[in-house]
């Protein structure tokens, strides 16, 4: 998850966020969805609800980051489609179900639908 935040954060920091979209990537020949999220408490970004609402230069920075960070490992990554908030939520749920099937013996059960709020 790439967290858009106006403050610097240490790697592996836990932050309460909401998804705004994802970028489809081809990473080492495999599909890889990069979830983009925003902290609830971030004053710069927390007015954005969907990745499509962000300024264009933010997309350029993210695409550049995702394509060059793998180059340091001698690997190739290609940025693809940009997807909205609802698509990101579907990807997250699929990943949770896959994890539950692999490690918990069954899919995650959704007792109630989350609110449309962030």
Q: What does each model-identified segment do?
A:
Residues 1-118:
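Hydrophobic N-terminal alpha-helices or hydrophobic patches in metabolic proteins across all domains
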């Amino acid at each position: 998850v790439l967290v858009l935040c106006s403050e610097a954060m240490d790697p592996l920091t836990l932050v309460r966020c909401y998804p705004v979209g994802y970028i489809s990537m081809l990473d080492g020949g495999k599909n890889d969805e990069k979830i983009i999220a925003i902290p609830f408490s971030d004053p710069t970004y927390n007015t954005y609800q969907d990745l499509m609402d962000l300024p264009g230069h933010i997309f350029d920075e993210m695409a550049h980051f995702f394509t060059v960070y793998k180059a340091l490992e001698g690997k190739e990554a290609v940025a693809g489609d940009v997807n909205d908030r609802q698509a990101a939520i579907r990807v997250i749920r699929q990943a949770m179900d896959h994890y539950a099937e692999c490690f918990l013996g069954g899919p995650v059960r959704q007792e109630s639908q989350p609110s449309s709020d962030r």
